[in-house]
Design a protein with these regions (language model features):
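Class I S-adenosyl-L-methionine-dependent methyltransferase catalytic core
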Residues: 1-140
Length: 140
């Protein structure tokens, strides 16, 4: 899925060029609106928007990146709320992606997209709260 209809057409063309003849459902939708296609946990693989695809990210003339922060906060909330038990793989040139999502990656694999350094981050989504409680001081 992608918010851009052009990306859907491009993806379908690339699947055909790759010889993938079976139908893969593609739809135009905002990332925050996705829902699991089944009750059985699976895998999500995505290349989330960054740079010019998300608006202002990486523009040194802009101090804060509210658009990107809002997008990744909403995406993270969607993944946490709807995809417990799923493995989520995000491919990005933004090496600070786990921090933006406020998620701890289970694994990160380095790749290059041409000269652009990227990572494939794996997140194992869990139900509920995954932070450990801080140690409480012993009473005297």
């Amino acid at each position: 899925s992608d918010i851009s209809g052009d990306m859907i057409v491009m993806t379908r063309n690339n699947l055909n060029k790759a010889g993938i003849l079976f139908d893969i459902p593609l739809k135009q939708i905002e990332a925050q609106a996705i829902k699991p296609p089944s009750e059985i946990p699976g895998i999500i693989l995505t290349n989330p928007p960054y740079g010019e695809r998300i608006g202002v990210r990486g523009d040194s003339t802009i101090e804060t990146d509210d658009m990107a922060s809002a997008f990744f906060s909403a995406l993270s909330a969607t993944l946490k709320q709807r995809f417990a038990g799923w493995r989520v793989f995000l491919f990005s040139a933004d090496l600070s992606l786990p921090k933006l999502l406020r998620l701890k990656e289970a694994r990160k694999t380095p790749f290059f997209n041409g000269a652009l350094e990227c990572r494939l981050f794996r997140f194992d989504m869990v139900a509920g709260f995954n932070r450990r409680e801080q140690a409480k001081p012993k009473e005297a």
